[in-house]
């Protein structure tokens, strides 16, 4: 008997939860269907691309930057470079080419044109002997607050 009561209560709660998200409102003879909170308040998700590879792995680097360009069409994007990746974004950095990918310079220019945040790790820069003034135009020194403030939605991370 307790099992049947509990099962009935569970069905009742589930049904109530389902209906709570699908109400209609009638205002001035206009019927508006109100959905669940997540469907009415859709926030733009963010893509966090982490690049620790450098010139030793052009496939990884250029794939990550190409993904950043593609994702920036409808997502907030932040590119973070550390370890060997910081070597790619200096004024003295050489261009990189790999198979059918656009070059490093082309991809960085596309990201700059789309106003995508590209940050370099300050500790990794220091270890490699670089300073903030060595960064290419448009590249900034990483700031911890920007890791979370670049988007209002969820953050998806891709690691290269």
Task: Label the predicted regions.
Residues 60-75:
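Histidine-anchored nucleotide/phosphate-binding helix
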Residues 18-29:
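Bacterial Sec signal peptide processing site at the extreme N-terminus
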Residues 13-16:
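C-terminal motif of bacterial Sec signal peptides marking the signal peptidase cleavage site
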Residues 68, 77-84, 118-122:
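Short internal beta-strands
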Residues 137-160:
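C-terminal partner/receptor-binding element of secreted or periplasmic proteins
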Residues 95-124:
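A glycine-rich helix N-cap at a beta->alpha junction
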Residues 42, 49-62, 89-93:
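Short, glycine-rich nucleotide/cofactor-binding loops
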Residues 1-4:
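Positively charged n-region of N-terminal signal peptides that target proteins for export
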């Amino acid at each position: 008997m307790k099992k049947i009561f509990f099962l009935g209560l569970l069905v009742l709660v589930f049904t109530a939860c389902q209906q709570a998200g699908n109400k209609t409102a009638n205002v001035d003879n206009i019927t508006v269907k109100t959905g669940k909170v997540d469907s009415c308040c859709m926030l733009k998700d963010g893509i966090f691309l982490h690049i620790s590879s450098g010139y030793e792995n052009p496939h990884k680097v250029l794939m990550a930057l190409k993904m950043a360009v593609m994702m920036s069409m409808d997502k907030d994007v932040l590119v973070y470079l550390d370890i060997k990746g910081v070597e790619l974004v200096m004024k003295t950095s050489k261009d990189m080419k790999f198979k059918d990918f656009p070059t490093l310079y082309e991809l960085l220019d596309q990201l700059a044109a789309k106003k995508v945040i590209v940050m370099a790790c300050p500790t990794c820069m220091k270890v490699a002997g670089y300073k903030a003034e060595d960064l290419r135009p448009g590249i900034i020194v990483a700031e911890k607050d920007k890791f979370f403030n670049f988007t209002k939605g969820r953050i998806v991370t891709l690691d290269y």
